[in-house]
């Protein structure tokens, strides 16, 4: 599933490249996509529960507007699935715990500002952003429910659905990286970012390290 999503991202980026203009960081628009590598992290929660998140791969798509050679604003969405193991502490029976394994899905719309230090084609940059992450833990929070209906093509169809525990969190990040503008309308960027999630019931806002490799099409 994840490999298929990344393949669609790559094909979409190639298709959009046809309209890219010659290299320039003057005022204008750009479209970008990144592959994200997020490192593992352990998070402690109130009551003694904890979760260990494995390192994983995600993708990011964004639209940017360049005010000038130095300052850019980007708006987009991150998507990732992360495997985790959580230890749940019973709040009634002391010492009773349960361990669950699963994978969560996170979709995070964001807004981010980039500042380029050099006006030339190769420049280091710093970034800062905010977002809101919608997280599905895939932990069931109710019994399975079955519904049936008449489908115009398949006839009488029944399916079983089970709701899962979802949450959301305010996020903020800072980063630094390098951007290289080629002469044919492409730009490449490599960045390191630190992301914080204001998770409900966490002892403190957990932070995650991210490494991003992306391509930008300049218009």
Which residues are covered by each model-predicted region?
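Residue-level detector of bioactive/disordered segments in secreted/extracellular proteins
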Residues: 14-19, 34, 150, 160
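Gram-negative (and chloroplast) outer-membrane scaffold detector with strong preference
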Residues: 23-27, 32-41, 62-149, 180, ...
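Extracellular loop and loop/strand-boundary signature of outer-membrane beta-barrel proteins
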Residues: 44-51, 94-102, 158-164, 198-202
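Surface-exposed strand-loop-strand hairpins of Gram-negative outer-membrane beta-barrel proteins
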Residues: 37-62, 167-168
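Short sequence motifs at beta-strands and strand-loop junctions characteristic
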Residues: 51-57, 101-107, 164-171, 205-207
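Cleavable N-terminal export/targeting peptides
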Residues: 1-27
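Low-complexity, compositionally biased segments in intrinsically disordered regions
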Residues: 145-159
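Contiguous, function-dense segments enriched for cysteine-driven chemistry
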Residues: 80, 165-171, 181-218
């Amino acid at each position: 599933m994840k490999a298929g999503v990344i393949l669609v991202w790559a094909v979409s980026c190639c298709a959009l490249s046809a309209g890219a203009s010659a290299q320039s960081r003057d005022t204008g628009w750009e479209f970008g996509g990144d592959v994200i590598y997020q490192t593992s992290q352990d998070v402690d929660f109130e009551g003694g529960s904890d979760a260990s998140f494995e390192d994983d791969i995600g993708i990011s798509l964004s639209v940017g507007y360049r005010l000038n050679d130095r300052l850019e604003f980007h708006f987009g969405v991150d998507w990732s699935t992360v495997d985790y193991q959580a230890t749940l502490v019973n709040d009634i029976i002391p010492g009773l715990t349960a361990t669950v394994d699963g994978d969560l899905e996170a979709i995070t719309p964001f807004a981010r500002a980039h500042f380029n230090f050099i006006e030339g084609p190769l420049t280091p940059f710093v970034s800062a952003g905010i977002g809101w992450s919608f997280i599905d833990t895939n932990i069931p929070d109710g019994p399975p429910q079955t519904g049936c209906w008449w489908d115009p093509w398949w006839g009488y169809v029944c399916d079983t659905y089970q709701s899962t525990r979802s949450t959301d969190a305010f996020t903020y990040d800072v980063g630094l990286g390098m951007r290289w503008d080629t002469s044919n309308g492409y730009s490449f960027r490599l960045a390191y970012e630190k992301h914080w999630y204001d998770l409900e019931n966490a002892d403190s806002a957990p932070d995650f390290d991210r490494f991003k490799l992306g391509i930008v099409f300049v218009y």
